[in-house]
UniProtKB/Swiss-Prot annotation:
Name of the protein: Ranatuerin-2PLg
Propeptide segments, given as residue ranges: 1-11
Family classification: Belongs to the frog skin active peptide (FSAP) family. Ranatuerin subfamily.
Purpose of the protein: Antimicrobial peptide.
GO cellular component: extracellular region
Pfam families noted in UniProt: Antimicrobial_2 (PF08023)
GO term, biological process aspect, one: defense response to Gram-negative bacterium
Location of this chain's protein in the cell: Secreted
UniProt-listed InterPro entries: Antimicrobial_frog_2
């Protein structure tokens, strides 16, 4: 086993992690924009 092959579980976990991180980034950006609208930065 050279470590290249990933099980389906590992692949799913990796995708979920990526999605979660992307969602967090997106949510942060949206929150910043909302704050700017409310407080006029």
């Amino acid at each position: 086993d050279d470590g290249v092959e990933m099980t389906e579980e590992e692949v799913k976990r990796g995708i979920m992690d990526t999605v979660k991180n992307a969602a967090k980034d997106l949510a942060g950006q949206l929150l910043d924009k909302l704050k700017c609208k409310i407080t006029a930065c």
